[in-house]
From Swiss-Prot:
Gene3D superfamilies tied to this protein: Haem peroxidase domain superfamily, animal type (1.10.640.10)
Similarity comment: family membership: Belongs to the peroxidase family. XPO subfamily.
Upregulating conditions: Repressed by the androgen dihydrotestosterone (DHT) and the estrogen estradiol (E2) (at protein level).
Glycosylation sites: 25, 104, 131, 238, 320
Protein's organism: Mesocricetus auratus (Golden hamster)
Signal sequence annotation: 1-22
Protein name per Swiss-Prot or TrEMBL: Lactoperoxidase
Amino acid sequence: MKVLLRLPALLASLTLLQMAASTRNATRTATIRETVDEVKVQVNKAFLDSRDRLKTDMSNLAPTVRHLSGYLKQAKGRTRTAIRVGQVWEQSLKRLRRMVPLTNVTGQGLDLTSLSWEVGCGHPAPTVTCNISNPYRTITGDCNNRKNPELGSANRALARWLPAEYEDGLSLPFGWTPGKTRNGFPLPQPRDVSNQVLDYLNEEEILDQNRSLLFMQWGQIVDHDLDFAPETEMGSDNYSKAQCDELCIQGDNCFPIMFPKGDPKLKTQGKCLPFFRAGFVCPTSPYQSLAREQINALTSFMDASMVYGSEPSLANRLRNLSSPLGLMAVNEEVSDHGRPLLPFVNVKPSPCEVINRTAGVPCFLAGDSRASEQILLATSHTLFLREHNRLARELSRLNPQWDGEKLYQEARRIMGALIQIITFRDYLPILLGDELQKWIPPYQGYKETVDPRISNVFTFAFRFGHLEVPSTVSRLDENYQPWGSEPELPLHKLFFNTWRVVKDGGIDPLVRGLLAKKAKLAHQDKMMTGELRNMLFQPNHTVHGFDLAAINIQRCRDHGQPGYNSWRAFCGLSQPKTLEELSAVLRNEVLAKKLMDLYGTPDNIDIWLGAIAEPLVRRGRVGPLLTCLLGQQFQRIRDGDRFWWENPGVFTEKQRDSLQKMSFSRLVCDNTGINKVPLNPFQPNSYPHSFVDCSAIEKLDLTPWASVKK
């Protein structure tokens, strides 16, 4: 009876508790919503202001290197949306964390699910619905993995093979707070490291006697197919990029690279090189880590996305949709001796026009926004554009019943195979040398459980190629002799330099230079040419250049990269602790001492620098750590790709046999006026030795595609 009497009171108490809990939850939700709404207004305004300022700056008579770099690194379309939402998430999280003790907003912890919902973290990349009968890749990379359709798609976070390491555990990079140490030692300034470790005189440059300039350029092509992390914007309308650029004020997403005492750039460029942090995305449920994760704006697959784009809107803009032949759009204003060039961008003015206002030639439009960054890259993009259209026309001749969409998709699929085959057959063996089989064994077929995403550390590992860039680029005539009045041009004059292609010889002289000239040798004592270390994006004497080495080091910290020894441990390599041990690993006591004097401990050496400092493996062009990191990544790219060219069902057996005949030399023969090419374009060749007529180079036979039904 007593229990029955107490029951109404118990129910009343439970009701009151439920009402109180409901009220608290409503208060928390309202507080989260109010906070997010305030942050959205602030961030959206900052993003709009930043874009408007960049347009204004680019219209000025004398834009700075920051403006040129900002144009190159700006996020667009869905990428910009994803980065903006990521910024709203992070700033809202920081505000709410400060409010917790005052308002008890989230009780035991922040309601991250509600926060994610209010921010709109799922909106930039909505849930994917896949057509399982579609025989072609999506432009975005979605639906490659049927169990996890988003795996490897564009505008997702780069994968972490080791947890991020930030100064505050969340987003601040090491080196942000003055006086704060890492592993007991202060971090050196990136520019100081660059000056002391990577500097050498251009005239002392050592060229690679066994690798052509194409070896360097192919690496950049592959990189631009796999990853791109655009810069984020300032998160506050009270703090602009101009303040970062002109006043070197660190704050928000500005992380300037300060010049050390005595640096010659102090006289010409003020106190610093402006540096803006990479764009990042929202964390995902179950929120095991809230550390900042940088975006990959591209698909992680080797799918020729630098030709076709990673967003549907861009992909459509790159096509000639009025043609029934599945063609890519070409430039309707200019051509290269009757051969097509890439279309111009519709942004006015573009950096390429700013560089040479007299010539007035805009930048080129391609699947990757960096296509006009340097002239050899623009040349490569031009070859790929021409090859797609050649393939589409030939496929149409063989299959007149195919419509434009099928012709486009089939040509696109063959282009993806071209990139894959040249990379794995011709490029990686001479990059990884004797370590190739250890890290990339023979293909055993598609594995659904393999994660193909590009890792955060790969974006630094693949920057080894910066050490292979020579100080000059050569243009050669039909006899592979110096072409024109300026046959050899310093690299810094070829940034954003499309006018040289349009008005000064076209791409053929540049392609010959790729085939016949040598890459720079990555050498411990002569690491990076001054054209990149002091004159990056410096097109003329009125614009002072960036330091690519210092940028790479600062970017390691921006991305929260673990140090050198953490990655050595990841790869099963020894972890040197003393000068003697580091000297043994590097086989170079002088270099080891420089690094120890700068960093105090090998644990702190930035991963990019530590990796490129190692001696090269036998018959390769990277050291043991890089062979591990690069080898693992490329194996994952291959084995985790359902559309890999060797995977049964992607191509027929006869088609695969035909595809193996593709080569860079054949690409040149079919798409330029060049008729003499080397048998092995990745090794330096001295004309006429090792050169043959194009008739001796095997052609891709497309007859296996005749009337093939997919």
